UniProtKB/Swiss-Prot annotation:
Enzyme Commission code(s) on record: 4.4.1.14
Compositional bias per record (Polar residues), positions renumbered to this chain: 475-484
Species in which this protein is naturally found: Cucurbita pepo (Vegetable marrow)
Induction: Hormones, such as auxin, environmental factors, such as mechanical wounding and a number of chemicals.
Pfam families the UniProt entry points to: Aminotran_1_2 (PF00155)
Quaternary assembly: Homodimer.
Keywords from the named record: Ethylene biosynthesis, Fruit ripening, Lyase, Pyridoxal phosphate, S-adenosyl-L-methionine
Alphabetical list of PANTHER family matching this protein: 1-AMINOCYCLOPROPANE-1-CARBOXYLATE SYNTHASE-LIKE PROTEIN 1, BIFUNCTIONAL ASPARTATE AMINOTRANSFERASE AND GLUTAMATE/ASPARTATE-PREPHENATE AMINOTRANSFERASE-RELATED
Enzyme class, broadest EC rank: lyase
Pathway info: Alkene biosynthesis; ethylene biosynthesis via S-adenosyl-L-methionine; ethylene from S-adenosyl-L-methionine: step 1/2
Name of this chain's protein: 1-aminocyclopropane-1-carboxylate synthase 2
Amino acid sequence: MGFHQIDERNQALLSKIAIDDGHGENSAYFDGWKAYDNNPFHPENNPLGVIQMGLAENQLSFGMIVDWIRKHPEASICTPEGLEKFKSIANFQDYHGLQEFRKAMASFMGKVRGGRVKFDPSRIVMGGGATGASETVIFCLADPGDAFLVPSPYYAAFDRDLKWRTRAQIIPVHCNSSNNFQVTEAALEIAYKKAQEANMKVKGVIITNPSNPLGTTYDRDTLKTLVTFVNQHDIHLICDEIYSATVFKAPTFTSIAEIVEQMEHCKKELIHILYSLSKDMGLPGFRVGIIYSYNDVVVRRARQMSSFGLVSSQTQHLLAAMLSDEDFVDKFLAENSKRLGERHARFTKELDKMGITCLNSNAGVFVWMDLRRLLKDQTFKAEMELWRVIINEVKLNVSPGSSFHVTEPGWFRVCFANMDDNTVDVALNRIHSFVENIDKKEDNTVAMPSKTRHRDNKLRLSFSFSGRRYDKGNVLNSPHTMSPHSPLVRARTY
């Protein structure tokens, strides 16, 4: 029996959480990661491997952080220059965290939001990354079985982060492409009514702003609509703002903190902000998650719960010094935004040349790519078939829209900031060859007699690189040939 199998004896011995598959590891979202892990692309060691485009990571400005650390060795307690503070930092720290870190974080959060709002360091609660912070807030607000309304498409791992251990439920607020997936009051009310009809107690609304996977920002009117909605129903509003410094073009980012300060009759105790340094600074391995709540009880309880997932004092010490360097922070935020904008513009421009459009976005480290025209029919089954071809034959790990609970098949999230320029070139060349091959086969299909064309209506999904002409001088553009009947990963169909 393998690690992924649970026999009858263990089903009787273990807890419901232990035997439950609520983690979602068997979803298409995580299956794509497994495909990459089993066959990772490397320009020299494995040029025919899978390119990771399913990881929402920002590596474009990583060198700036490395340079700062080189210039400030005293910021680390593990260097000769910083060793004198080793004992005081390495000894026991309570769950409030280092005061200098909370102060630096509050200042940084304000700077990211253009200085239009200030944050109180005493309200900052730390957790083990955004995942831990998210779960802690849910534990504070909901009992098992309670529900949260979440506009879809939404972050695929919310099903794990928000539901698995808390036993809370998610009710999607369905948004569609006709208005660029914007949240409306009508959609909120429909979802709320649906929860009531299912005898579920709605405890709040959860949004990501900027949006993952859309890469768009909420405007002030929509944020005010959300605040009004939760005020009327006396439920909570959780705003995940972990991508707030990834905005690279207009409109600028508006934090819910600004709306809270400006709106009259706002019930502040219902508003909670999630933040992290994983996306804005590109430091997911540091596991820095932040809860900023306007509710005193939530602040107190979340701080006590943070004992189960603290940020190491060594990490706090280093980041306190870095985030307190205002000149560095100003330069980093400006340059990071510039680099993200340039990468996004280049990536979408090349896709557009191939006839592939993306949702117009202004933030994030990904694009919401529209491949509806490549589906053999407008179903999620067809989307999964196309996704398997992209994973197994084109060798790109992109995430299918169904993983994000979108209502329209054919959308894919594609990350562009977790790789260097050369890898981007390889990925774009693979996409170009794939689309070109499909278009050629489609042209041939149109030229066939009607009966033959009917028999060949699956040409769109029977793609193989074996018939391509390769540039022998550029082996990086030549993925493994793989039979469409031998999928590398087991994907879930909807």
